[in-house]
Amino acid sequence: MEPDFIVIGSGPAGCAVASRLSEDPRHHVLLLEAGPGQRQGLLGSNAALAALVYGTRPSAYNWGFDSLPDPGLNGRISYNPLGRGLGGGTTLNTLMYMRGNPLDYDGWAQAGNPGWGWSDVLPYFKKSENNQTFSAPGDPYHGQGGPVWVEELRTDNPWHATLRQACQEAGWPYNPDLNGAAQDGFRPTQVMMKGGERHHAGQAYILPHLGQRPNLQLQCDSPVTRVLFEGQRAVGVEVLQGGTKRQIRARKEVIVSSGGLLSAKLLQLSGVGDGALLQRMGLPTVAHLPAVGQHLQDHVDVILGHHIPGDPHLVGISPTGALNLWRAMRRWRQERRGMCTTNFAEVTGFMRLATNAPVPDIQYEFVVALAMDHGRDVYAKHGLSTHVLLLHPKSRGSVQIASPRWEDAPAIDYRYFSHPDDLATMVEGVRRVLQVYDTPTMRSRVKADLRTAHCRSDEDYAQFCRNVAGTNYHPTSSCRMGPDAATSVVDARLRVHGLQGLRVIDSSIFPTIPGGNTTAPSYMVGEKGAALLREDWQ
């Protein structure tokens, strides 16, 4: 049967859209995923192993794109792990459940997007969530009974208490709920895991209903090469299955949910984008929308490293570390607890660099291993890595097709630090977190600063940042929402400007990047986008 809706991409937003649409038995929904289906065994369920094995190199489960050389990074290329397969990025990520700041969303509404303020989107955050800590009925900030399982880490790691003590010695407050009344402060990370196992979007929204809902269909290993149009109406897709291209028509709408980089690429390959770019690529222009692929934002990330010798609670490459890992794997198999339940970024927090700042400027992630360069550069030591994330970058980049072939990677140009305020804020953010390592609690444990010991001046720190910074895997806003077709791609109902039957529903529509990890906001956008579709097709 011809589907009513075709959803392209099974990341957090796409899975939410497909699942919620199919709750209505009148809607026949086809979810298309370019990558494989469900992974089995340890690599599918163990959070740490999945990130290490699949996140460090391109594979069937990781698009693994490289950026263009970036002047802001002294000409370096930034590697971009990107989940491929059922669940999308939730199969590779660090599982952190963070929403951002309420003022982020009020800013979306004030920019001309009615219905996207904090009070509008909070119900959709709650609808997606099944929080095991904040589980009281009627909790004003958290949901219970939603598809996305949120729980505390099960690592039983004493470093949670140690870092809490060090942060408090540095004057940084403990915050029991970073997604609650206030964002400032630190706590152990809440994670999207279920019983000590990775809980990805496909498990949350799709797999429980396959076979139970005859109107929901999933097809994996099915990359969409372009959206099909008749005039200005999207009528279906061209998809590659088993080495053969075929066309599938949609009776109602096509929904692009391919993420912060690939949604813009698919629109451009389909003739929707800047007309001059499409002409250079030899593609016909269906709709001239110059904002497609523009306004790319990301949380640029600088990683610090501190050597803490022989600590059995830190993941490390050493004989002791190997023995600890073997013991931890045995415990994980028996109890689903211990080191092998780690998401690595076990403690996180948010800080304003100026007391009068309206929202936090920096997010810190304390990682229980010395891992740099996306896990591809691992020290043969034990220690802590500290990620310093710029929450509200002023720099803007772009993502564009590099050829008319769907197989070719897009040209990703982040233009990190192209706005001078970003580098100055990052330098101050690095200096601030080093205060934590200069507390009595940390001085007694840390043997060496492995990354910034040579830095003395702001210029030293700025050069260090340029030499090591890269992505924190949060590309957004390349199909941003807004009222003006000259500067945005979709309207407040997520309809592509000037076209019919086509919406974009994922992190690419964020008008500005939220101040926190982007998976929870992507689930929210999927939930709200599905509600808009159901309203329009009652």
Where are the predicted features?
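N-terminal redox-cofactor-binding region of secreted/periplasmic oxidoreductases
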Residues: 1-538
